[in-house]
A protein has these predicted regions:
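Short, surface-exposed beta-strand/strand-loop-strand elements in extracellular ectodomains
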Residues: 355-369, 504-518
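Short active-site loop/helix that positions an aromatic residue
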Residues: 56-68
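Hydrophobic/aromatic beta-strand segments within beta-rich folds
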Residues: 295, 330-337, 342-349, 362, ...
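N-terminal BTB/POZ boundary and linker segment
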Residues: 1-58, 92-109
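Disordered, acidic Ser/Thr/Pro-rich linker "stalks" and the adjacent N-terminal cap
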Residues: 240, 244, 248-339, 351-354, ...
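Extracellular carbohydrate recognition and processing domains
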Residues: 369-389, 518-538
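Intrinsically disordered, low-complexity regulatory regions enriched in Ser/Pro/Gly/Thr
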Residues: 33-37, 42-44, 49, 73-74, ...
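Alpha-helical scaffold in the C-terminal half of BTB/POZ domains
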Residues: 2-11, 50-52, 59-60, 75-77, ...
């Protein structure tokens, strides 16, 4: 029984149990500020004498706490002069100290800027954050440069980033504004050095020239410090991006850049690959820039209209994809973005209405002549959604070239998307090294061989709801296997699987991996160990597309059952320790036409399991009639049994 019940108290109506007189407290403290009562300190700002109360100042700010009660000389004074600050802004700050209230929208922008400086100087972090948020919301072409300077001065990174993003979207207007001429050299360099400040380089040079003439004290007498400032700003101008005509007719006559520097720029442009030039591009985080509404176009490929329309569900054997024949010298499918864009992530949906796999590579370019290969999966089997990452670069053209189709000689792409993603992804030889499970239906992994009432029960993430009849994938011992295909190659070093454990039976098994469904390498051999429930596996990092789980023993019958598979292992405290298996590494760049000498098993001739160890002799291997009946029922309802890649050759493909 609660204390209220013991005393016979009744719970009050909602809202009556709380007393909130904060507004009255604020009004009373404001009245105290305006009165002459109890004041014990006078602050002098721009010859204005401002009475205040030490204890209130100290309670609101660490700066004033140290100044007034920290044992400094000022602690003994009744008057303290605060130099180099605005009296008007300090009055606003003092009102905030006493009341916690400021009306920023009723203040002039210059006063708001001064208040931000005081909040930073006198350690009022909440006020600093609020003023910063307000300034972000009112950024315009007239005030962005002023706000950017203040944010740079106080190193307010969030506000600086907001100014940068605004400048990126309005680059041309910012360069032509009068406020641009007021930028400090440091802020100007910070603005121009960024790849995402995308405007013609000659326009940037012209704006810098205007800025220099506006800020130089005398065109004939140039001081050393201003010369250093000019040099630092000029280094932010990318002269190799300016045409020869503009260099000779505008840059050289300005006398801001020496002839040697101009010649160096010309030499760099002449001798460098186009892909090595320091291009600028638009930056639109998490926005698909390869979309027709942003001006992207398909320049090459058959049935071009489908690729960039954003439709990723309504496609079949007749429509909804773009294609090209797989043949030597084919230029593939080429997309031109609406604007040069900074990207580091491309998503591709390969046609996936059957179990076929493709191989391909992706190249990018700025001039459609000099191509840089950012992804090369020509030695790997890939299917459905492809999510590839690479170091960010400025791109205007994207080319995807199919090199292999397990069914025919045509490469089919349903959708192509290009992004800049802030997500940090670890890469090893162009392959993603994932932290999270990639053997999921959401990431387009699938089971290509095995028996189950639900094709992808092994990958649906359900590790609780399984019994004698459902929730597992299986295969007959000595015949076939359970094979999982990931959507694309990943570099992994661990796996985890859940063996069916509704009774005390034990299994033995081994696990192999492959990148092409032909060359296999063993990463775990537990064919001589009795295993139950969760199995965690660790091995040397390997490129993996296919995972083959082969059961070799079941102490209850002749069927191997697996409930769940994940890769890499997502440990959740199940009590199992990783078993490290020393494994030779399959070369990432091993050609499909040259089988690796590391092959320990071939898809057509699975290895013969070793003889049973002595510790299995106590178990009765007689099959349980119930499980035999379940397996036969699954066959009768036409479930996908051993749905291998090889069987796809007899199925229909998209019409050519």
């Amino acid at each position: 029984m609660s204390s209220q019940q013991q005393l016979g108290l009744v719970a009050p109506p909602l809202g009556l149990g709380e007393v909130d007189h904060v507004r009255s407290l604020s009004d009373n403290l404001n009245a105290l500020l305006l009165s002459d009562n109890y004041q014990d300190i006078t602050l002098i700002v721009e010859n204005h004498r401002i009475p205040a109360h030490k204890i209130i100042l100290a309670s609101r700010s660490e700066y004033f706490r140290a100044l007034l009660f920290g044992g400094l000389l000022e602690s003994q004074k009744s008057e303290i002069e605060l130099k180099g600050i605005s009296a008007a802004a300090f009055h606003v700050l003092l009102k905030y100290v006493y009341t916690g209230y400021v009306s920023l929208s009723s203040m002039k922008e210059e006063l708001v800027k001064d208040l931000l400086g005081l909040a930073h100087q006198y350690a009022f972090p909440e006020l600093e954050q609020s003023v910063s948020d307000y300034l972000k919301s009112i950024l315009s072409q007239t005030n962005m440069c002023l706000v950017y300077d203040v944010a740079n001065l106080y190193q307010l990174r969030a506000l600086m980033e907001a100014c940068r993003q605004y400048a990126d979207k309005h680059a041309t207007d910012i360069l032509q504004s009068e406020a641009f001429l007021q930028l400090s050299p440091g802020t100007l360099c910070d603005l121009l050095q960024r790849d995402s400040f995308c405007v013609a380089e000659i326009e940037i040079f012209r704006a810098v020239l205007r800025w220099w003439h506006h800020n130089s004290y005398d065109d004939c007498i140039v001081k050393e410090d201003t010369t250093n400032e000019l040099n630092s700003v000029l280094k932010s101008v990318r002269l190799p991006l300016i045409t020869l005509s503009e260099l000779l007719n505008e840059v050289r006559p300005s006398h801001l850049v020496s002839s040697d520097v101009i010649l160096d720029a010309l030499k760099f442009r002449t001798e460098s690959r186009d892909s090595d030039l320091p291009y600028r591009g638009q930056l639109m985080p998490e926005v698909n820039v390869a979309h027709s509404r942003l001006g992207a176009q398909v320049l090459q490929g058959e049935m071009r209209t489908a690729l960039l329309d954003g439709e990723t569900t309504n496609y079949d054997m007749e429509r909804g994809f773009t294609r090209h024949p797989i043949e030597d010298g084919n230029a593939g499918i080429v997309v031109r973005l609406g604007q040069p864009s900074i990207i580091n992530h491309i998503k591709v949906l390969l046609w996936d209405r059957d179990m076929r796999s493709y191989s391909y590579f992706i190249e990018v370019s700025m001039d459609q002549r000099d191509w840089v290969r950012v992804v090369d999966y020509s030695n790997y089997h890939c299917r459905s959604w492809q999510r590839v990452y690479f170091p960010q670069r400025v791109v205007r053209f994207i080319r995807i070239v199919g090199t292999h189709n397990t069914v025919n000689k045509v490469f089919h792409v349903v959708s192509l998307e290009a992004y800049y993603s802030p997500v940090v992804v670890r890469l090893e030889k162009e392959l993603i090294v994932p932290k999270h499970n990639v053997a999921t239906i959401q990431l387009s992994a699938c089971v290509v061989e095995g028996v189950s009432r639900s094709r992808n029960a092994l990958l649906n993430g359900d590790t609780k709801n399984y019994d004698w009849d459902s929730g597992y994938t299986c295969h007959q011992l000595g015949s076939g296997a359970i094979v999982v295909q990931l959507a694309q190659p990943y570099v992994v070093s661990s796996m985890r699987l859940l063996l069916w454990d509704c009774d005390d039976r034990r299994y033995s098994f081994y696990v192999e991996v492959s990148t092409n469904n032909r060359d296999w390498i063993t990463v775990c051999d537990r064919s001589r160990q009795p295993c139950q429930s969760w199995q965690s596996i660790s091995f040397a990092p390997q490129p993996v597309v296919y995972v083959r789980i082969v059961g070799t023993q079941n102490t209850a019958n002749d069927v191997f059952h697996c409930v769940h598979f994940e890769c890499p292992a997502q440990e959740d405290g199940n009590g199992f320790e990783d078993v490290v298996v020393s494994t030779p590494q399959l070369p990432v760049d091993a050609p499909l036409s040259n089988p690796s000498p590391l092959v320990v098993a071939d898809a057509a001739t699975p290895p013969v399991p070793p003889p049973l160890p002595d510790h299995f002799s106590n178990f009765n291997p007689r099959p349980l009639d119930r499980e035999r009946r379940n397996l036969e029922e699954e066959e009768e309802i036409n479930l996908p049994i051993r749905f291998t890649v090889g069987s796809l050759t007899s199925q229909r493909s998209p019409r050519q």
